Amino acid sequence: MKHIISAYNFSRDELEDIFALTDKYSKNLNDTRKILSGKTISIAFFEPSTRTYLSFQKAIINLGGDVIGFSGEESTSVAKGENLADTIRMLNNYSDGIVMRHKYDGASRFASEISDIPVINAGDGKHEHPTQAVIDIYTINKHFNTIDGLVFALLGDLKYARTVNSLLRILTRFRPKLVYLISPQLLRARKEILDELNYPVKEVENPFEVINEVDVLYVTRIQKERFVDEMEYEKIKGSYIVSLDLANKMKKDSIILHPLPRVNEIDRKVDKTTKAKYFEQASYGVPVRMSILTKIYGE
């Protein structure tokens, strides 16, 4: 593996290797091999971040590497007008890899085409967030010991959420029984994404119609800024909150995931249920990203 730009960059075999590595790293985050010893990784975040930035930083340090970088472009030469290509060339001079987040779709792919060192996409616009998808499916596999045969429901903003695109794509490496796409018409998953998929999907608007069939409920935030009519947003927003009532209608062993941060799309009462796995999901950020870095640099 060199660049990680899309969820499609992972084969099933590679994902299963990452699952096994993550199991190991979860027990001991201090890897004795220190596969990044003597290496410097640049974390170049042109958008602010908390979890992704810090978990990559911690993963690199745990593997013996050094970290340089920034979160937010305000303090960089980008604020003075430097173009992305020049920034990437500069980072090639300073480091052995680039973990990059950018507001524009395709920015990570562009960077990989001019970079001599590995580029890892940590989120590019509304395009993809592939390492988050690996965290998602690792969490699912940890709970069910399989991905195959499960019924999924993705709920909320399915049009602009890059985590959704990566999850839909990474599921092509497995055999889900069915994926429900639950959203208002305005925020349905993009047709070009759905046309790529090799498993059955069904679009619905009311989560209560299908929630009793679901093994994995994946929730995303509905973005207020996409709506022209604020009253329409308020109406739709209230229809896509995971209430305790909705959670209680799910299967006994089902789980609820969220890539975080959340706003109000999951009722805080749901946090206390056994189905709420989103904080556990977030805790796997460091060991999963250690495993991905190991696949790139340690083999």
UniProtKB/Swiss-Prot annotation:
It is an enzyme of class 2 (transferase). Keywords: Pyrimidine biosynthesis, Transferase. One of its GO terms (biological process) is 'de novo' pyrimidine nucleobase biosynthetic process. Its EC number is 2.1.3.2. It catalyses: carbamoyl phosphate + L-aspartate = N-carbamoyl-L-aspartate + phosphate + H(+). L-aspartate binds at K80, R162, R221. Carbamoyl phosphate binds at R51, T52, R101, H129, Q132, L260, P261. Pathway: Pyrimidine metabolism; UMP biosynthesis via de novo pathway; (S)-dihydroorotate from bicarbonate: step 2/3. Gene3D superfamilies: Aspartate/ornithine carbamoyltransferase. GO terms for molecular function: amino acid binding; aspartate carbamoyltransferase activity. Heterooligomer of catalytic and regulatory chains. Belongs to the aspartate/ornithine carbamoyltransferase superfamily. ATCase family. Catalyzes the condensation of carbamoyl phosphate and aspartate to form carbamoyl aspartate and inorganic phosphate, the committed step in the de novo pyrimidine nucleotide biosynthesis pathway. This is Aspartate carbamoyltransferase catalytic subunit. It comes from Sulfolobus acidocaldarius (strain ATCC 33909 / DSM 639 / JCM 8929 / NBRC 15157 / NCIMB 11770). The lineage of its organism: Archaea, Thermoproteota, Thermoprotei, Sulfolobales, Sulfolobaceae.
